[in-house]
Amino acid sequence: MSWSGLLRGLSMSLNYGLALAPRPWGTRPMATLNQLHRRGPPKFPPSKPGPTEGRPQLKGVVLRTFIRKPKKPNSANRKCCRVRLSTGREAVCFIPGEGHNLQEHHVVLVQGGRTQDLPGVKLKVVRGKYDCGHVQKKK
């Protein structure tokens, strides 16, 4: 077998191996000029809005309060509430701090920011605004 055949096989295996290599999140493989010519410029899907739909905070009404258990390595009882937002959507919100006075029909201010160990909880209640009191000072 000739050297050129070996080199061609080596370069093809390297290219094939690089194509299968894991890529960091959010990156796409680059298109060749021929692919760009045939397909046109890449069309990316529009990004989905977050739970607050691009707003920093939203007002909402508490539907019910409950306790959730966090994911595997952590153990606690995380206080959460189901809130009907001013946009009409319902969402689960985390209540930060120790102790709270929230009950059904209380009006709260909600901001984005997920709770890492609670799956599906992407909003937090703002303490000290509307019907949600400040965190009490320890005695």
From Swiss-Prot:
This is Small ribosomal subunit protein uS12m. It comes from the Eukaryota. Residues 1-29 form a transit peptide. InterPro entries: NA-bd_OB-fold, Ribosomal_uS12, Ribosomal_uS12_bac. It is found in: Mitochondrion. Component of the mitochondrial ribosome small subunit (28S) which comprises a 12S rRNA and about 30 distinct proteins. CDD domains: Ribosomal_S12. GO terms for cellular component: mitochondrial inner membrane; mitochondrial small ribosomal subunit; ribosome. It comes from Bos taurus. Residues 37-57 are annotated as: Disordered. The keyword Transit peptide applies. Belongs to the universal ribosomal protein uS12 family. The keyword Mitochondrion applies. Keywords: Mitochondrion, Ribonucleoprotein, Ribosomal protein, Transit peptide. One of its GO terms (biological process) is mitochondrial translation. PROSITE patterns: RIBOSOMAL_S12. One of its GO terms (molecular function) is structural constituent of ribosome.
